[in-house]
Amino acid sequence: MPKKSFQRAERISVQIHRDLGALVQAAVRDHGLPSMSVSDVEVTRDMAHAKVFVTALQAERSFEAVAGLKALARELRMQLAHTMRLRFVPELHFHYDDSLDRGERINTLLRDLIPPADAEKDECG
């Protein structure tokens, strides 16, 4: 029985991710929020809460983006209730997904470690 519940939570996560992505884009346009996208959604097993991870295109405005979505959470949840066929839509909790920022920092560090090809040729002779 628990396996069925997990599969349902996963299906609902995917559906919320898809539907909320469109709603977030509309909120960006309508409310002047920084440009962002939904990167992941995790729904609890009891379907009461959903962690929504968002990525802002401008990392320096990430706090503003998440704060704007938190202010609109109730409205977004009501809009989801109209599009989804659920008796109860999970409460939305927005979090900034910094994985892209961390990945970019790692790429920068790796690029700095690799010596330029011209410098290697000069050293070899």
From Swiss-Prot:
UniProt organism field: Xylella fastidiosa (strain 9a5c)
Subcellular location(s) per record: Cytoplasm
Quaternary structure, from the entry: Monomer. Binds 30S ribosomal subunits, but not 50S ribosomal subunits or 70S ribosomes.
The family this protein is said to belong to: Belongs to the RbfA family.
Cellular component annotations (GO), alphabetically ordered: cytosol
Residues annotated as signal peptide: none
InterPro entries with a match to the protein in the record: KH_dom-like_a/b (IPR015946), RbfA (IPR000238), RbfA_dom_sf (IPR023799), Ribosome-bd_factorA_CS (IPR020053)
One GO term of the biological process aspect: maturation of SSU-rRNA
UniProt superkingdom: Bacteria
Keyword Transmembrane: no
Name of protein: Ribosome-binding factor A
SUPFAM superfamilies with a match to the protein in the record: Ribosome-binding factor A, RbfA
GO molecular function terms noted in the UniProt entry: ribosomal small subunit binding
HAMAP family: RbfA
Major subcellular location class: cytoplasm
Function: One of several proteins that assist in the late maturation steps of the functional core of the 30S ribosomal subunit. Associates with free 30S ribosomal subunits (but not with 30S subunits that are part of 70S ribosomes or polysomes). Required for efficient processing of 16S rRNA. May interact with the 5'-terminal helix region of 16S rRNA.
Keywords: Cytoplasm, Ribosome biogenesis
